[in-house]
A protein has these predicted regions:
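Sec-dependent signal peptide recognition
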Residues: 13-20
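C-terminal motif of bacterial Sec signal peptides marking the signal peptidase cleavage site
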Residues: 26-29
């Protein structure tokens, strides 16, 4: 499956909906995740929609293809949009639904300029209308020759999250992990009156690219120079009388570092039984870590999150974080039960080494779409960030730093 979208930067109001559009594309050809018996009859509509607070909601409509009789490139054909009538309601009131007509319009949904990525958006739909936490969302889709489908969800209240201490380049709590980790504390308060579902993700924003040096007036070397990495920049130090450094020539990038789950009980799914049989540990799709409040209901709880240090500032993107620092971001997403069940079914399927060995049945991907496939599921995200100033020099593997509240 194509997961090259993992580092795409997306406009805030659509970023999670667009992320799940890409996820639906990635899974559109993975027929083992669905009920194969249903896929063997006539084509059915496939609907994906992930409403949240804001004024624009992406609606993805494709169709399933009968695996027993279809001839051709099923992977490509299953990604194509469908000419359909789409009704989107907020608290029973229909909202305006538009269609993405061209690359230029698709570009408004993303800062990504990749033509293939943008082409996957053409022909899809989006609803325009303000919506907030507590709103009920209904989606109905009909198309010629296909049965009508419908689904409903709601937008949950967001839960605030705060970043506490951050410890850099420490030994992981998992004895099987050979790399150093950065340890983050993230605190939130779970509502006591409801059963709640969440996802958490850690990202890191950092500089990358070539640093441009422009000759000062009178410099006999009349051409620009470029520091390709932090070491190159150090080599130019001492020549400040010759060059002006254009620090805005560097771009910012967002990465999703690998997370070690054993330090946090809410997301730790590592099984000693799996270890005994040599099976892989639990896999979270696209580094979105889901959990529920069964063990923490009504509590103010601090998550202890570990991410791979070696994905980051001392090795990745040429070491510019030694000069500029970087920013950690924690995204805590309050999700609806259908959102949680959908992601959990994907995680369970891709983590089921017992099924791969023929010892257990594969569970189909969850769907709440009546008459078809896919999912309509609401969410609400809260983010917290903490800037990490550059250390004077690169620490060794047993030398780290702590950034307090």
């Amino acid at each position: 499956m194509n997961t090259n979208h993992r580092r795409i930067k997306i406009n805030v109001s659509w970023k999670w909906g667009l992320f799940f559009f890409l996820m639906s594309v990635a899974f559109s050809s993975c027929i083992d995740d669905f009920d194969v018996k249903k896929l063997q009859d006539t084509p059915r509509l496939v609907l994906y929609c992930f409403p949240t607070e804001g004024d624009t909601t992406l609606i993805v409509v494709t169709k399933s293809l009968p695996v027993s009789s279809f001839k051709g490139d099923i992977d490509t054909q299953s990604r194509l949009p469908v000419d359909a009538s789409v009704v989107y309601k907020v608290n029973g009131m229909p909202q305006e639904v538009k269609r993405i007509e061209n690359i230029k319009e698709a570009q408004s949904f993303s800062q990504v300029s990749d033509s293939w990525f943008l082409s996957t958006l053409i022909g899809q739909y989006y609803a325009v209308g303000k919506q907030k936490a507590g709103d009920k969302i209904e989606v109905q889709v009909s198309a010629d020759g296909l049965s009508e489908v419908s689904a409903s969800t709601s937008i949950p209240e967001k839960v605030d999250v705060n970043i506490g201490d951050i410890h850099l380049k420490e030994k992981s709590s998992d004895h099987d992990v050979y790399f150093s980790v950065d340890k983050l504390e993230a605190t939130f308060s779970d509502p006591a009156s409801t059963t709640d579902y969440y996802s958490v993700k850690v990202t890191r924003k950092q500089k990358y690219g070539n640093l441009k040096g422009v000759p000062k007036e009178g410099n006999r070397w009349q051409y620009d120079v470029y520091a390709n990495n932090y070491q190159d920049y150090l080599n130019y130090l001492g020549r400040e009388d010759e060059y002006e450094w254009c620090f805005d020539s560097l771009a910012s990038n967002i990465v999703w570092p690998e997370m070690v789950t054993t330090s946090e009980p809410l997301i730790n799914k590592k099984s000693e039984l799996d270890d005994d049989f040599g099976f892989d540990e639990y896999k979270y799709f696209d580094d979105v870590y889901i959990f529920n409040d069964r063990t923490i209901n009504g509590q103010t709880y601090t998550m202890h999150l570990e991410v791979n240090s070696n994905d980051s500032y001392w090795h990745t993107y040429d070491g510019w974080d030694r000069l500029f620092g970087f920013t950690y971001n924690v995204q805590l997403c309050k999700v609806t039960p259908e959102y949680y069940r959908f992601l959990k079914s994907i995680n369970d399927a891709q983590s089921n080494s017992w099924a791969d060995a023929g010892l257990m049945q594969v569970t189909p991907t969850y769907s709440n779409v009546k008459g078809g496939f896919g999912v309509v599921a609401g969410f609400n995200v809260c983010e917290a960030s903490k800037y990490i100033a550059p250390l004077p020099s690169a620490p060794s593997d047993n030398q780290g730093g702590i950034y307090t509240k």
